[in-house]
Amino acid sequence: MASKKMEALGSVVAEALGDKLVRSTLALDELTIVCKASDLLSVAQTLRDHADLAFEQCIDVCGMDYSAYRDEPWDGPRFAAVYHLLSVKLNHRIRLRVFAEDDDFPVIPSVNGIWNAANWFEREAFDLYGIVFEGHPDLRRLLTDYGFVGHPFRKDFPLSGYVEMRYDPTQQRVIYQPVTIEPREITPRIIREENYGG
């Protein structure tokens, strides 16, 4: 059961955002709202500047790949950015989810101009998921190497990667080469004893 405080926050958010609010979910005493990518900047501005919301702090931004979400097939957009916002003044939190409209080239506007703290979070989501944050002042890889191929947190990225690096003593430097790990299927051998389990 949701607290009255969170229900009241949900009502204020719904009134402030109007038709820009696609969906609102209250679960486990946390409010999650969804808006379109085209409305993100105005929604973020409202969440920050509205006197009854005052979400002045962006505490996290994470990318999501919904292509293999839960056990059933996902039929919505594949990539999303999820913003975790905090109002220090009013002591409440909200989660804002924005889906990229194109699965092949996911683009979401950058909120770096609204919350400066989103800068490196958006770079991380770009690096690991390939979500392009349009208008970001310095969108480049943050965690992987400069020549890294692909985005490692995507569900279709191979566990072994595409290349491996090693030190080559003849060239006296680190080199990249195609992965030499052979994929194999491991089938456990099960031995049942006569009196097993009782």
Swiss-Prot record:
What EC number(s) is this enzyme filed under? 7.1.1.-
Which Gene3D superfamilies does the entry link to? NADH:ubiquinone oxidoreductase, 30kDa subunit (3.30.460.80)
Subcellular locations according to the entry: Cell inner membrane
Keyword field contains Nuclease: no
Task: Fetch the PROSITE patterns from UniProt.
Answer: COMPLEX1_30K
Please report the record's description of how this protein sits within the membrane: Peripheral membrane protein
Q: Which reaction does it catalyse?
A: a quinone + NADH + 5 H(+)(in) = a quinol + NAD(+) + 4 H(+)(out)
Asked if the Swiss-Prot or TrEMBL record annotates the protein with the keyword Membrane, the reply is yes
Classification via Pfam families: Complex1_30kDa
- MF terms (GO), sorted A to Z: NADH dehydrogenase (ubiquinone) activity; NADH:ubiquinone reductase (non-electrogenic) activity; quinone binding
Q: Which GO terms describe its cellular component?
A: plasma membrane
SUPFAM superfamilies, per the entry: Nqo5-like (SSF143243)
* Keywords (A to Z) from UniProt: Cell inner membrane, Cell membrane, Membrane, NAD, Quinone, Translocase, Transport, Ubiquinone
Purpose: NDH-1 shuttles electrons from NADH, via FMN and iron-sulfur (Fe-S) centers, to quinones in the respiratory chain. The immediate electron acceptor for the enzyme in this species is believed to be ubiquinone. Couples the redox reaction to proton translocation (for every two electrons transferred, four hydrogen ions are translocated across the cytoplasmic membrane), and thus conserves the redox energy in a proton gradient.
PANTHER family reported for this sequence: NADH DEHYDROGENASE [UBIQUINONE] IRON-SULFUR PROTEIN 3, MITOCHONDRIAL, NADH DEHYDROGENASE UBIQUINONE IRON-SULFUR PROTEIN 3
Its assembly, as annotated, is: NDH-1 is composed of 14 different subunits. Subunits NuoB, C, D, E, F, and G constitute the peripheral sector of the complex.
Which family does the similarity line name? Belongs to the complex I 30 kDa subunit family.
Q: Give the protein name, as stated in the record.
A: NADH-quinone oxidoreductase subunit C
Organism encoding this protein = Chromobacterium violaceum (strain ATCC 12472 / DSM 30191 / JCM 1249 / CCUG 213 / NBRC 12614 / NCIMB 9131 / NCTC 9757 / MK)
Q: Gene symbol?
A: nuoC
